[in-house]
């Protein structure tokens, strides 16, 4: 919705008030999931807690107790993609999880759910992501890409259903 609202505004077709929010959703009472529960997820979760207490997590590399101590219900990837309203992809890349988020999982997502890719792009099969985001009503935002910088003729640049940022997260001087 943010992407389309931006385009509408530029083209003098913006909507205001309730009309502009008809297809929007609130975080309140949503199911929010983390794929990868490292430092980033641990910092992000407290910011989301005022909106919901329904958190799911998938991180097979961490002890179950750590996830449970952080009030996350442990779920399989299939269950996370079926149940979640918002999914944060925050995992590191390994030989075992390259392209693990593929068309099978993406097709399980609820209509109007959100997928936010903020860690390593190669955890997601971007070819599948482009196809699915065109066909299904899911919201996608990504700050990372399989190849950076993204080539000028890359098909991802033509996607109207994905919100992009050029790997800005974490790139600050300290």
Language-model-detected regions and their locations in the chain:
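Proline-glycine-enriched beta-turn/loop adjacent to the NAD(P) cofactor-binding site
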Residues: 38, 143, 169
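Adenosine-phosphate binding glycine-rich loop
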Residues: 146, 150-152, 157-174
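Conserved beta-strand positions in the Rossmann-like core of class I SAM-dependent methyltransferases
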Residues: 56
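Rossmann-like adenosine-cofactor binding region
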Residues: 62-155
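Phosphate-binding beta-alpha-beta segment of Rossmann-like dinucleotide-binding domains, i.e.
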Residues: 1-31
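Short, well-ordered alpha-helix to beta-strand connector turns
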Residues: 30, 52, 84, 112-113, ...
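Oxidoreductase and adenylate-handling cofactor-binding alpha/beta cores
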Residues: 1-7, 46-53
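Glycine-rich adenosine-cofactor-binding loop
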Residues: 20, 25-49
């Amino acid at each position: 919705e943010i992407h389309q609202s931006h385009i509408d505004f530029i083209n003098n077709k913006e909507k205001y008030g309730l009309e502009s929010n008809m297809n929007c959703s609130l975080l309140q009472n949503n199911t929010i999931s983390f794929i990868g529960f490292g430092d980033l997820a641990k910092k992000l979760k407290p910011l989301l807690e005022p909106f919901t207490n329904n958190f799911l997590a998938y991180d097979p590399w961490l002890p179950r107790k750590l996830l449970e101590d952080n009030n996350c219900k442990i779920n399989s990837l299939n269950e996370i993609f079926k149940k979640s309203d918002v999914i944060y992809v925050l995992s590191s890349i390994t030989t075992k999880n390259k392209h693990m988020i593929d068309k099978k999982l993406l097709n399980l997502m609820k209509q109007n759910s959100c997928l936010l890719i903020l860690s390593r792009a190669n955890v997601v099969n971007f070819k599948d992501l482009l196809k699915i985001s065109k066909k299904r009503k899911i919201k996608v935002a990504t700050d990372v890409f399989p190849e950076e910088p993204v080539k000028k003729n890359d098909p991802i640049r033509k996607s109207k259903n994905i919100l992009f940022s050029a790997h800005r997260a974490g790139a600050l001087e300290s």
